[in-house]
Amino acid sequence: MKIRISLNILAKFLDSFAHLLFLKNKEIYTPRKEQAACVEVLERYFQANPENGRFLMNCKMRFGKCFTLYSYAQKNNINKILILTFVPAVEESLKDDLNHIEKNYKFYTDDDLQKSNFDLKNQNEPYVVFLSLQNVLGKQRIDGAKTDFDKERISKLQEIDFDLIVFDEYHYGANKKRTQIKVEKVNKKIDNPEQQDNQDDAEEELASTFKLKDIKSKFQFSYKQLVCLSGTPFSSLRNNEFSSKDQVFTYSYFDEQKAKSAENHPLKLGQYGIFPEMNIYCFELAEIFTAQEQEIFITPGKGKNKLPEISFRKLFQTENVSKESSKPVYRFVNENLVEKLIDSLIDKRKGFSHTPLSWENIDKHKHSLLILPTRVACFALANLLKNHWYFENNDFQIINMSESQFGNGKKALIELNKHLDEAKKTNKNTLTITVAKLTIGITVKEWSTVFFLKDLKGAESYFQTIFRIQTPYIKNCKNLKEICYVYDFNMYRCLEVTNEYSKQTQTDPKFSASWFQNLDKFLPIYLVRGDEIQKTDPEILQKYEYFIMDKRAFSTRWMDESNIIDIDVLCNVGQDEDAQKILKKILAHKKFKSSKKKREFEDVHLEKSPKSEAFSEGVRSGKDYAAEQGNVLEELENFWNFNQALEQKAKAEFQQKNFDDNEWNNYKKGFNFGVNKHFEDKVSIKKIVQNKIKDFKKRKGRTTSTFKKWKWLYFWWE
């Protein structure tokens, strides 16, 4: 006896069977404390704003924003969820997050909406509908008009009263214009890589479609609650799009790293131990290129506050050297400069003491991402590296994501993972070259390093890109990525976007000095300048904030060779105003160079000041004390204890005099002046310091801490 089953019934049976397998393979997660806190904030906000409320989750990449949102939906009996995104490649990760909550949600995509027999209104089980905004806008275009299919798709969504609409990667769309044009650019198939450069720009800046208030007027979707997800919603925050504090939950990279530091599990990986620490290295390109070579891609700053402009588009400018127009072959116009840059990252003898791609360091950077300004530059660099002796002989696989086989979105991610899997089987290193593809919202756990060689100034895109490498990578219970690395070749850009990120992700309304301490501890920034590496410390970062309107002064101070000193020394001196004053006086500060000025200065205090007697006595005591100390050179070498001795000696002498306590400052000034006067009369301090520097250069090299100390003394003398 034969039993006939209709195709529709069979399809439903297979769908139910697949769903049962899905439920069996679930691995339920317990929300971390910050995720649970976010759920509570969401509950409070939407209880106070039950209709058409809107909320922003300003949480770092890898926070688990969608899992947190699913946890909130499960707890509050939210059954009809629509997720809209500009990054179709995140589909799998959003679907996978449903595996980690107890409630069973169906997951529908655009493929389901295309089925003629699919009716979302008749779905009784809780569900999540995932759509890219490109699809909602309509990617099948005829002269810019929506097709009947597009209208039908949108009409299906308009029939539903959604409990919750979610905008994923919302930074893409915060109040941007010309979106429709950009969407059409992205969806248009282009075979010519030179024309594709414009498409990449459109894809990177593709910004959602509208302001939140325009949702109903544009799509006429009905919803009770709306949540925007982003790790970098800086434009929205600057524009006060979410004006109430109750509308925003913030969790930053610094919050995560502080939790990791407090966890302190020496023998096992804790909840936060899996998240890599990020280190940023800024390479000073002027160290490896001649002045003539720099003119090609570096424009000197003009005016008081102007910085040099670095153009990576000019550095990586290309030309087509193929005689066949149908088969273009690209190479760099300034190929010798590009080769010089690549060689400097491989061989210490070619410019930089830190060489991330050298054989001894490559294990830290086994799978790297390299960001370039144009698609044609990607083709030119891929060709160059494949014929480079180092990459040819050391088992490197060069992956050019601008090749047509990668496509866009989900297809590109699948193709990339295929290449990475092949490389891992043969233990090869990989270098993935791209302009913007797969730099937003996606997860590639193998990437541990990013080289930033692109003209990009926005903090949103910059941090979205570099946080691709901060994805945890655990294999066989072993943490394969404890630290991840960012290599930037534009110091000014790096400091500016880092400053912006720090401001926009802090929860304390006051941008305090302690925040700079967090930046220094959890996101260290190093300047690589020839054979020296200098770590920025909190004081330098504060100086950057101070010099934000006068960056020329800051960049000169940071890059000055004389500023390469021990961090503890800089912090100690920088935090003590009296120490700075004493230091300047001991080193014959220019204020005291002219004997005439010195006499005038002394006369002013001795004759016109109402406390001149205390000052005069201090001068005499200071001279006597300096004379007792003997060799001035020994005093300079022991200066770091000497300034404290000055303070103690002056205090002891003052207490023996018959002065009022309120005259202490005048006495101390006079004492310091007397010490300085004795040293100036006794010896040329500038000559001592110069000779000492020359001696260290000849005998002990430029890297000893003592040499750096003398360089710094000379810096202050000047």
From Swiss-Prot:
Q: According to its UniProt record, what is one Pfam family this protein matches?
A: ResIII
| A GO MF term | ATP binding
What does the function comment of this entry state? Answer: Corresponds to the C-terminus of a putative G subtype type II restriction/methylase subunit.
Q: What is this protein called?
A: Putative type II restriction enzyme and methyltransferase RM.MpnORF110P C-terminus
UniProt source species: Mycoplasma pneumoniae (strain ATCC 29342 / M129 / Subtype 1)
Upper lineage: Bacteria, Bacillati, Mycoplasmatota, Mycoplasmoidales, Mycoplasmoidaceae
